[in-house]
Regions:
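Membrane-helix interface motif
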Residues: 42-51, 164-171, 346-361, 426-443
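Short aromatic-rich membrane-water interface segments that cap or initiate transmembrane helices
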Residues: 55-70, 177-184, 364-376, 445-451
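Transmembrane helix-loop-helix hairpins at membrane boundaries of multipass inner-membrane proteins
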Residues: 1-97, 171-176, 202, 485, ...
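Hydrophobic alpha-helical transmembrane segments
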Residues: 65-74, 190-191, 374-383, 449-467
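Aromatic-capped, Gly/Pro-kinked transmembrane alpha-helices
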Residues: 436, 440-451, 472-561
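Cytosolic juxtamembrane amphipathic/interface segments immediately preceding
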Residues: 56-58, 323, 400-404, 524-537
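Hydrophobic transmembrane alpha-helices and their helix-loop junctions in integral membrane proteins
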Residues: 80-95, 101-116, 126-412
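Hard-cation-handling environments
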Residues: 409-460
Length: 561
């Protein structure tokens, strides 16, 4: 077993080797991604690297069941996404993506809050560069800058929380944090912003779809799931996460149903699925924590598959709206099948990975007698089938004949989708392959007759509801307003209004000072006789003091008010 070799090192080495002439840069990155994945499989549980820094104990490297599971899926999806991205012309995007992945792996292997924060900020920089590298999209620059601002805000909040927490607790080791002081709440807020929790959830749908066909796949896997890891590590059992999770679940469903853009549908679906994970973390039992971890693992796989199928459509047609595509199953059958498998997995269809993972969270709520939470999770499962399980494949691959006849995407893209499709089914049929990675040895059997029948009935009625409501679900060329309107448009309007008010008051005070100046000058001219000579000039001290007093009073009023 391997103790101290950090998987991120090989990804960073891959980036360095891309600057060497005569090397095939993409194959070099692919090779180092493979090495990093193989290394993650052999990380030794209990391995750590400790360091003393400014009277604090830093733990730069910590391997346990939770962190190793996340490292395995992070390196695995990096390898598969790299296969998918072999046709990506921008080497800058791939370098940025590997920096991004390295930072995410560093974050989940950090055993202290300072190391976590450093990797957290590097992750924000890397992901921003992934978005900005899509120079063919005129919207990517502004979306990337908004994305960066939101994550810098989250980073500042997290930094203040960590500094305050360290000053009180005299300890920065990253373990379960109690919400008994304001600084722990700030740390929680920093994590939730990156998780895509309202009111900042809009950054996911604002930024991810503006990346390239391959960049979106990388982005979907790491930022929100690193936050899920951090919440598991620091705030498992915090009831407030249940409520945040439920809001995210239904927020994602509603906006995904309203959306017309293919990848924005799937971006809102990310928020929805992370909401399920937050509910599991908030419940805080061994079963629900296991469920949150496995669901994060499975979600990375099937969400990447869905985004790869959507990216393949966009890559081959240059169309990204549901209203512009349809009937693509005729010429893109493999992409269609892979997209359907991803849709079934996200819908928790039996024999797929979503069924064996999400059900642990739902069952965790039932076992804790959280009846209202259980009902909402069941209803939300039907909602997921509506927007991602049926809407996405129906409008993109079936429904109308758009007249488009694109070919299948390049073979490397097909290979990546086929691998992910296989994994969705593999973990659905053999869930113990995933369960053996979990931190808690909690027996869970997903395939009971009651559970399978109930889930099939739920999906059947949700499917019927979709086709009954189909006339109302057909998309038009509309724009969906989200919370980001508040800072994209509302904040700008507010600042412009403030600027105008300040400008008007500046003019008013300027006129007032001019009037005072004229008044004082007149007093000086009257009091100072220039005709009798310098030696005979005299000054009326009382008038001068009066004028200065008026000026001082006005100056104080301006300063105070």
């Amino acid at each position: 077993m391997i103790n101290f070799i950090h998987p991120s090192l090989f990804l960073l080495l891959g980036v360095i080797f891309t600057f060497v002439p005569f090397f095939n840069k993409k194959l070099v990155l692919l090779l180092f991604a493979l090495i990093s994945f193989l290394l993650s499989l052999f990380l030794n549980y209990g391995a750590s690297i400790d360091l003393n820094f400014l009277s604090f104990e830093l733990q730069l490297f910590r391997v346990d069941f939770i962190s190793k599971t996340f490292v395995i899926i992070f390196t695995l999806i990096t390898l598969i996404a790299s296969i998918y991205a072999l046709n990506q012309k921008s080497i800058l995007e791939l370098r940025a993506a590997y920096l991004y992945v390295s930072a995410a792996i560093g974050a989940v292997l950090s055993g202290d809050l300072i190391s976590l924060f450093v990797f957290w900020e590097l992750m924000a920089i890397g992901s921003t560069l992934v978005i900005l590298s899509n120079t063919s999209n005129k919207h990517s620059e502004l979306s990337g800058l908004r994305y960066l601002l939101i994550h810098l805000l989250g980073g500042v909040i997290l930094m203040v929380g960590i500094i305050g927490y360290a000053s009180i607790e005299k300890n920065i080791l990253f373990s379960l944090l109690n919400l008994d002081n304001h600084f722990s709440w700030l740390i929680l807020a920093g994590f939730l912003i990156n998780a895509g929790a309202p009111p900042f959830a809009a950054w996911v749908a604002d930024a991810y779809p503006e990346a390239s066909f391959s960049g979106t796949v990388f982005l979907s896997a790491f930022t929100t799931k690193t936050s899920v890891y951090a919440l598991i590590r620091g705030f498992a059992g915090s009831e407030i996460l249940i409520y945040f999770g439920l809001v995210m679940i239904f927020y994602g469903i509603i906006y995904a149903l309203l959306e017309n853009d293919i990848r924005r549908i799937l971006a809102y679906s990310i928020v929805n699925q992370v909401g399920f994970m937050l509910v599991g973390i908030g419940i805080g039992t061994q079963l629900s924590i296991n469920g949150a971890i496995t669901h994060a693992f499975a979600h990375i796989i099937y969400k990447a598959l869905l985004l790869m199928s959507a990216g393949s459509v966009i890559y081959m047609t240059q169309k990204r709206r549901c209203t512009d595509v349809g009937g693509l199953y005729r010429t893109m059958p493999i992409t269609t099948i892979c997209g359907i498998i991803g849709a079934l997995a996200i819908s928790s269809f039996p024999l797929t990975s979503g069924f064996t993972t999400k059900s642990m969270i739902v069952s965790g709520a039932a076992y804790e007698h959280l009846f209202s939470v259980w009902i909402l999770l069941v209803a939300a499962s039907a909602g997921v089938f509506l927007h991602a399980g049926i809407k996405f494949p129906w409008f993109v691959f079936f429904q109308k004949d758009s007249g488009l006849r694109p070919k299948e995407p390049p073979k490397n893209m097909l290979l990546a989708m086929v691998i992910l499709s296989f994994l969705c089914i593999l973990f659905g049929i053999f869930p113990n392959l995933l369960y053996q990675l979990l931190p808690f040895d909690k027996l869970y059997i997903p395939y009971t007759s009651d559970h399978v029948i109930f889930q099939l009935q739920l999906l059947l009625f949700a499917g019927l509801a979709f086709f009954v409501m189909l006339p109302w679900l057909k998309r038009t060329l509309t724009i969906t307003l989200d919370f980001d309107w508040l800072y994209r448009v509302g904040l700008i309007k507010f600042l412009n209004t403030v600027r105008k008010v300040i400008h008007s008051y500046t003019i008013l005070f300027s006129k007032l000072f001019d009037s005072i100046k004229i008044f004082v000058q007149n007093k000086i001219n009257v009091s100072f006789n220039t005709e009798t000579g310098v030696g005979k000039n005299h000054w009326m001290t009382g008038n001068m003091v009066f004028a200065l007093s008026i000026i001082l009073l006005i100056y104080l009023l301006v300063l105070l008010f």
